[in-house]
């Protein structure tokens, strides 16, 4: 679940542990966390796109009677700064999985008359907002008459879900067929713990969606891609009713669109299988979405010839490299080895791993001795395919044999199966289309 790991990563940025209460359930829409200051909460909510709102919990219970008892036991000295006569306030009633009538919400508010509110009600611009939260479960086909649980507290901050709308690829200047969704881009940046003045690199940069998200959090960004046309903003457009890309469609223009051009270092045409960087720990985070061979091809430069260095003084015909297939298992092996060498200690690698769901097991996740697996979250793409958001952290410097460790690892054989992902993807697609055709033929008869 990306939300859990996003919150953990953002708390880690402040050096805070994730301490849920004893009733914590990951799939619940309401989480109660202990040991956080209001400053900690505001810092997390200033970046999170998964969390909707955060509150200081004053009372809770399975019934309104239990809620009343809990609220009356809350220390009055903690309430009074927000309830004195010179303050203004508003009370909201929020529900999950059920809509209450206006009269029902008003009744809920009136029933809180046992609380010592002395201030003035202000619906438009209150100094303090209080909320009653009612949880009606997660099954829309089985909504209970009464809430499963009720919470009451003081609103502290909202999350940054507005970023998903403001940075939507629908309104972005430069896009491609596989431009990463804005929400997922920000989640990846948070998983990587990207912060101000970090240096972030994307080796499969494409149209730069991940660079846009990282630059929003104050990081300097750069990237490479093997596709010359994408890097230089040339060729056919991915937009409807537009044949060719415009002269100013490029990654730099995307950052300029959001006022982050100063965070742009550069992007280059480069083959990810052949590193062009000096041997040093350069990057605070590496965030990428490698091509899967479905909508974007997996390519690297190579040769069909067996080339050897000619003797001195012997002239040979010049050779132009050609494009070759780049197997998914090789992509991930190279990506992890590159990250082990070029991430700073404690830096994070965040990337997407496509999988064929019927064959998936945790052993298929590529490993590297220098990188510790932090999280593994699934995004379902279809009934038979999904992709896993993998987060890894550098825990040691690479040694000479680390780059070959995957060959001796028993996990290596299972994740070579990623090479067949494209064939399995289209096999499942063709089977589904065949069933639909048979069904339409049957209905036609």
Question: Which residues fall in each region the model found?
Answer:
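Class I S-adenosyl-L-methionine-dependent methyltransferase catalytic core
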Residues: 1-42, 53, 96-97, 123-131, ...
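A short N-terminal interaction module
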Residues: 2, 74-140
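Residues that form generic nucleotide/phosphate-binding pockets
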Residues: 10, 70-74, 112, 254
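Conserved AdoMet
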Residues: 21-83
């Amino acid at each position: 679940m990306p939300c859990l790991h996003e919150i953990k990563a953002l708390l880690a940025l402040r050096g805070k542990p994730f301490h849920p209460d004893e009733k914590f359930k990951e799939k619940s829409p309401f989480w109660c966390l202990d040991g956080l200051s209001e400053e900690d909460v505001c810092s997390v909510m200033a970046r999170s796109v998964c969390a909707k709102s955060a509150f200081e919990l004053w009372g809770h219970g399975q019934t309104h009677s239990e809620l009343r008892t809990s609220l009356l036991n809350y220390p009055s000295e903690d309430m009074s700064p927000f309830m004195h006569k010179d303050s203004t306030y508003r009370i909201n009633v929020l529900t999950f999985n059920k809509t209450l009538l206006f009269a029902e919400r008003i009744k809920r508010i009136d029933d809180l008359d046992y609380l010592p509110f002395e201030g003035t009600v202000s619906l438009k611009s209150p100094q303090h907002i209080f909320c009653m939260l009612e949880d009606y479960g997660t099954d829309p086909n089985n909504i209970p008459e009464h809430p499963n649980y009720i919470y009451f507290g003081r609103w502290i901050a909202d999350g940054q879900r507005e970023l998903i709308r403001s940075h939507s690829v629908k309104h972005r200047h430069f896009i491609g067929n596989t431009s990463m969704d804005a929400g997922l881009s920000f989640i990846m940046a948070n998983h990587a713990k990207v912060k101000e003045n970090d240096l972030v690199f994307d080796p499969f940069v494409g149209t730069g969606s991940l660079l846009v998200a990282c630059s929003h959090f104050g990081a300097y960004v750069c990237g490479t891609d093997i596709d010359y046309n994408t890097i230089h903003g040339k060729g056919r457009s991915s937009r409807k009713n537009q044949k060719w890309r415009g002269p100013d469609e490029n990654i730099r223009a995307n950052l300029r669109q959001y006022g982050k051009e100063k965070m742009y270092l550069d992007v280059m045409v480069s083959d990810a299988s052949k590193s062009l960087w000096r041997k040093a720990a350069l990057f605070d985070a590496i965030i990428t979405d490698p091509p899967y061979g479905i909508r974007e091809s997996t390519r690297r430069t190579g040769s069909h010839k067996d080339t050897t260095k000619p003797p001195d003084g012997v002239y040979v015909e010049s050779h132009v490299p050609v494009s070759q297939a780049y197997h998914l298992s090789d992509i991930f092996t190279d990506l992890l080895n590159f990250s082990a060498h070029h991430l700073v200690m404690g830096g994070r690698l965040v990337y997407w791993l496509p999988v064929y769901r019927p064959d998936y097991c945790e052993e298929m996740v590529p490993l590297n001795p220098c990188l510790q697996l932090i999280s593994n979250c699934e995004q379902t793409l279809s009934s038979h395919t999904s992709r896993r958001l993998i987060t890894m952290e550098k825990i040691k410097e690479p040694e000479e044999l680390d780059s070959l460790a995957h060959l001796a690892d028993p996990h290596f054989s299972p994740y070579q199966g990623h090479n067949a992902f494209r064939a399995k993807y289209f096999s499942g697609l063709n089977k589904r289309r065949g069933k639909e055709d048979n069904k339409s033929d049957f209905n036609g008869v």
